């Protein structure tokens, strides 16, 4: 893969394959941090994909969409803004308030490492158009305004020094500095919010700038690719793959090409036959939302269940953190990362470097859910939704041995005609999902 050259056409680009590292890594950290982290407000409503888009945008739970929610001119975010800041206070007036005075990129990288993350994806430019990197093409960036720091550069260095791969998010289709008509529904994403020819050139240049300056392992585009420059997409991808031969891109450029599919909360269609990635926030927002206290975030059991179920079905989990404007990660988010990291440390061999098994995930009649992964010919079984105390379940058609990844877990097995009967006589809720393997 390293000696191959891509030549700016679709036939060449289509020869790129998903690198082993992305198949192996399983868990990454998404970061949404920007101007929107100052107001840090959105209503706590529903997950993406749960309701019709018109209803969703009216009460948008994404704090990073504050600009659009304000621009709509009604709804909870608009009301909050008028009451707290006044009708003459513009979104851009938040920029001097974003100081990132307590930001330590090395500390962030240490937290990600402890959490077990194998890659990180930073929002270098979200839909508001504010860039977290110095750019030849705009002064609207975090080096010349706000924090006065190259957030992308500093974090990339810290993350890589921690032995973690660095990826970059870029809002390819939407930039409210170029087209800022309010978005009321999904159709507006590709209609009233469609960019100009000037923006198509701008985004193409900035994408190449990010590739040249940071060589990201993941290029995570969002919403789409400007229709005014569709013919330039294979040139960009060729440039990226020539610069980063083992790089990967998601499915949000257009319908024609991707290395992996994406699912966001309940939105998106994926299957276990093709590599995919689940992304979601700790709560219902990606950007920090001061409305979301500890009780509004995903529980630790649900988080570990999400990771296991995703990995067992050929996915990676890209879990978002939403830092505060001062650069600190909220303690309730850090707490979840640490617990997840501790669980991954114990169950490491059943997650990283695995592939989905021929055995598909199954929900048993007793409410226990079984997930399967395989690695180097070994079978791994994860038992979820166990109850406190004694539990038992049957793995149909399997007649081998199993041992727990966690040596503190007592497991009894009996080979029966139907399969292996597994008993866990003393389950404790702090074990969360119990991992088993036939690797001796």
Mark where each language-model region is.
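Mature catalytic domains of secreted/periplasmic carbohydrate-active enzymes
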Residues: 1-440
């Amino acid at each position: 893969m390293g000696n191959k050259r891509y030549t700016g056409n679709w036939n060449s680009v289509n020869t790129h394959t998903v690198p082993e590292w992305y198949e192996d890594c399983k868990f990454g950290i998404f970061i949404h941090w920007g101007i929107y982290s100052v107001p840090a407000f959105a209503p706590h409503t529903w997950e993406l994909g749960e309701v019709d888009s018109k209803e969703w945008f009216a009460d948008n739970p994404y704090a990073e969409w504050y600009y659009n929610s304000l621009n709509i001119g009604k709804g909870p975010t608009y009301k909050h803004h008028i009451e707290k800041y006044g009708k003459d206070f513009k979104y851009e007036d938040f920029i001097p308030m974003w100081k990132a005075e307590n930001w330590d990129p090395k500390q962030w990288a240490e937290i990600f490492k402890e959490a077990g993350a194998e890659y990180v994806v930073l929002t270098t430019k979200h839909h508001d158009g504010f860039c977290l990197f110095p750019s030849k093409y705009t002064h609207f960036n975090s080096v010349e305004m706000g924090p006065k720091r190259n957030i992308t550069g500093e974090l990339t260095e810290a993350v890589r020094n921690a032995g973690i791969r660095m990826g970059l998010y870029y809002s390819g289709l939407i930039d409210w500095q170029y087209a800022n008509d309010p978005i009321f529904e999904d159709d507006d994403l590709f209609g009233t919010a469609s960019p100009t020819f000037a923006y198509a050139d701008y985004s193409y240049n900035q994408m190449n700038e990010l590739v040249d300056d940071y060589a990201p392992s993941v290029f995570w585009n969002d919403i789409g690719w400007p229709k005014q420059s569709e013919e330039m997409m294979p040139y960009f991808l060729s440039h990226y793959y020539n610069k980063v031969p083992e790089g990967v891109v998601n499915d949000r450029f257009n319908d024609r090409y991707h290395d992996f599919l994406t699912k966001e909360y309940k939105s998106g269609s994926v299957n276990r036959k093709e590599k995919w990635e689940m992304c979601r926030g700790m709560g219902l927002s990606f950007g920090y939302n001061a409305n979301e206290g500890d009780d509004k975030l995903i529980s630790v059991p649900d988080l570990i269940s999400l990771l296991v179920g995703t990995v067992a079905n050929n996915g990676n989990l890209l879990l978002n953190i939403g830092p505060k404007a001062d650069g600190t990660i909220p303690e309730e988010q850090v707490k979840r990362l640490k617990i997840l990291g501790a669980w991954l440390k114990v169950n490491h061999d059943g997650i990283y470097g695995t592939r989905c098994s021929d055995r598909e995930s199954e929900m048993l009649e007793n409410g226990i859910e079984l997930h399967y992964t395989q690695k180097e010919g070994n079978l791994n079984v994860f038992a979820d939704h166990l109850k406190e105390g004694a539990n038992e379940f049957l793995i149909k058609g399997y007649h081998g041995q199993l041992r727990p990844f966690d040596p503190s877990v007592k497991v009894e097995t009996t080979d029966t005609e139907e399969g292996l009967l597994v008993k866990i006589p003393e389950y404790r809720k702090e074990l969360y999902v119990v991992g088993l393997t036939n690797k001796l």
